[in-house]
Amino acid sequence: MGRGRVELKRIENKINRQVTFAKRRNGLLKKAYELSVLCDAEVALIIFSTRGKLYEFCSSSSMLKTLERYQKCSYGAVEVSRPSKELEQSSYREYLKLKSKFESLQRTQRNLLGEDLGPLNTKELEQLERQLETSLKQVRSTKTQFMLDQLSDLQNKEQVLVESNKALTRKLDEISVKNHLQLSWESGEQSMPYGHQQAQSQGFFQPLECNPTLQIGYNPAGSSQLSAPSNAQNVNGFIPGWML
């Protein structure tokens, strides 16, 4: 006959309870070992008795590593999913805030353009009027400053052009003076007469006068005395003896 079904309830007899605990504990540890060997599974078993005594089995090298792995698998997913939900809720709140701000800006823009003024009360209309006046002052101030900047730029450009014009005028005057002097010099050479030019050239180049008489020990008185008879002889047709 087979063994009857055991009712699962606390064993009241203390001795029987201890005996059953020891048998079932050993059987559970054996089953855990067999499971880890047969199926190549990482198995960790922790048992505390009623007196607080610890019984454990771990198929890996360290029970702590198995517990850390268990903690990552069990609580890590919860911790990851929790921030994602919080981030989603925070993003949705931020979206609602931005949407409300965008709608408010759209209403303000329409009011500044003179649209949808019906729902506004007197205080809101006065505030809108002050905003428009302030905006108009800023626009006018910006426009005035822009025009002043443009005027300053134009004045600087005008000054540069004036200086350039003065420089060009001085250069043209110098060129005109040079051309006038050159034309005056050329016209003066062309109008000068040929005789005057020849006289000038002769003034520069004076030929030397040669006397065929060799005047060694020259005496002016003697020469004059000799020249008179010689002239007379020449007239009579006689040749002087010193010339033979």
From Swiss-Prot:
Expressed in flowers and seeds. GO terms for biological process: flower development; positive regulation of transcription by RNA polymerase II; regulation of transcription by RNA polymerase II. Residues 1-61 form the MADS-box domain. Gene3D superfamilies: Transcription factor, MADS-box. Keywords: DNA-binding, Flowering, Nucleus, Transcription, Transcription regulation. CDD domains: MADS_MEF2_like. GO terms for cellular component: nucleus. InterPro entries: MADS-box/MEF2_TF, MEF2-like_N, TF_Kbox, TF_MADSbox, TF_MADSbox_sf. Probable transcription factor involved in flower development. This is Agamous-like MADS-box protein MADS2.
